[in-house]
């Protein structure tokens, strides 16, 4: 009898639906911090960023009723629950309630570690919402996914932060994102393929490791509750300058690297969490080896250092950074997408 019930529920094994979404991580070059509503609603904001070919994958399907739990989640740990309210992961719990999801199995995997300064949590939020809509058989465009990921993280999960990560993960590509009191707009950077390729080749990324900086960062963050409006306004003006460097062929691309160095120094002046001694030492090593400038992407649980390096200096920078993992990457334009979609005949009972 049991076998008949099962075959009735799933006419064929391939009728069990599975969705896999693929969502890129982002690197932000200029304007970080001006994407906070507390700043841009009064002053306007803008960010220059790109997504690149490192992704997170969210696999979602309905969970067959063979188990004494109705939802199974697999990320850095495994959760098995019968009630959505019992889910520990805030983003998954709130997203499931928000979109009225029940009886699912969700698996998260990523090319790079979480909490490492690449907007990983927002890429996950966007990819998860994309997968949930696909599971429901509904289409959600990039703006809807970005807006709802912002709402999920900032309102439902009450996590502090800006808006740029969710927008970048959703839309993909090399963009200028403008923020006003009325919302945001995503404007692709008009740069020739050759120049974009050259920029990509001149950027080198290194992983600094996980926990070295977290206590320094927490102390600095606690002590750093000062007004940064003037600094953020200067960061905002740099977005215009950086965009001009990228789009104007008469300007050397090396200016982009020098501007990264300028921003680094600007951030240092505020005594922000960026200026931990270990990272300063690594940054200075890179500059001494020939990098024109660089940027720490994130801090806390870990981080990535990106340097702008002319081709003839790259081997020297690799040697100077030999203690760190080097991560080659390419820019990408796709944003979040569904890469596997199997329709199903199974209906959850809830």
Where are these regions (language model features)?
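Core catalytic loop region at the nicotinamide-binding pocket of NAD(P)H-dependent oxidoreductases
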Residues: 103
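N-terminal pre-triad scaffold of radical SAM enzymes
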Residues: 106-114
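Short aromatic-hydrophobic micro-motifs that form the base-stacking/packing surface
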Residues: 116, 295
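C-terminal nucleotide
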Residues: 13-30, 35-37, 41, 47-49, ...
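DPxDG-like acidic metal-binding loop motif
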Residues: 118-138, 142, 170
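Short, Lys/Arg-enriched N-terminal segments with co-localized hydrophobic residues
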Residues: 1-17
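Glycine-rich active-site/cofactor-binding loop and its immediate structural neighborhood
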Residues: 302
